[in-house]
Amino acid sequence: MTDTATSAGKIQPRLKQKYKTEIAANLSKDFGFTNVHQVPGLVKIVVNMGMGEAARDGKVIDGAINDLTLITGQKPQVTKARKSIAQFKLREGQPIGAHVTLRGDRMWEFLDRLLSLALPRIRDFRGLSDKQFDGNGNYTFGLTEQSMFHEINQDRIDRVRGMDITVVTTAKNDEEGRALLKQLGFPFRSVEAAS
């Protein structure tokens, strides 16, 4: 960090500080890494809302964009259909969803809010499945509704919208990715509870 950033009092996100001070050292010790660049870290978080109903009703996409903006603090990119499919009444170029890619401090702050505020608010939440890794240490999970985020006003929800959240890491395999996310505080379901 530069001297100007330090003197201006730039505050690092809580989870990022924890990663730099504790988690990186723990992972380095657990896996026997000799180089700091071998230690897995976070690259980006992608939050995606697919809105199939947007093909029939154009106003649906506006609600999704508004919700994603409130949740992530960043304007979403509108996803458009790549090709026309007659059975789904879908035309090429029609908006069918929205997604946000978070990097840097915004990513760390979103992850902190997700883990400490949003996930505990889910009714009957028993933890996330640890089987949703892609083989390269990246983790994807879905949320069924947007109301668990504090930023969303419960009274102004026009319809329930689910979302997919992908956490992209620099881990080489699922074992490293799982260890990183567990140390960051991801509430994975225990093996006994799953069976």
From Swiss-Prot:
Residues annotated as signal peptide: none
Name the keywords, alphabetized: Ribonucleoprotein, Ribosomal protein, RNA-binding, rRNA-binding, tRNA-binding
Extract one GO cellular component term from the record: ribonucleoprotein complex
Q: Extract one GO molecular function annotation from the record.
A: rRNA binding
The record ties this protein, via InterPro entries, to: Ribosomal_uL5 (IPR002132), Ribosomal_uL5_bac-type (IPR020930), Ribosomal_uL5_C (IPR031309), Ribosomal_uL5_dom_sf (IPR022803), Ribosomal_uL5_N (IPR031310)
Q: Name one Pfam family in it.
A: Ribosomal_L5_C
BP-aspect Gene Ontology terms: translation
SUPFAM superfamilies xref list = RL5-like
Output the PANTHER family linked to this UniProt entry: 60S RIBOSOMAL PROTEIN L11-RELATED (PTHR11994)
Listed under subunit, the entry gives:
Part of the 50S ribosomal subunit; part of the 5S rRNA/L5/L18/L25 subcomplex. Contacts the 5S rRNA and the P site tRNA. Forms a bridge to the 30S subunit in the 70S ribosome.
Q: Which family does it belong to?
A: Belongs to the universal ribosomal protein uL5 family.
Describe its function. This is one of the proteins that bind and probably mediate the attachment of the 5S RNA into the large ribosomal subunit, where it forms part of the central protuberance. In the 70S ribosome it contacts protein S13 of the 30S subunit (bridge B1b), connecting the 2 subunits; this bridge is implicated in subunit movement. Contacts the P site tRNA; the 5S rRNA and some of its associated proteins might help stabilize positioning of ribosome-bound tRNAs.
The protein, known as? Large ribosomal subunit protein uL5
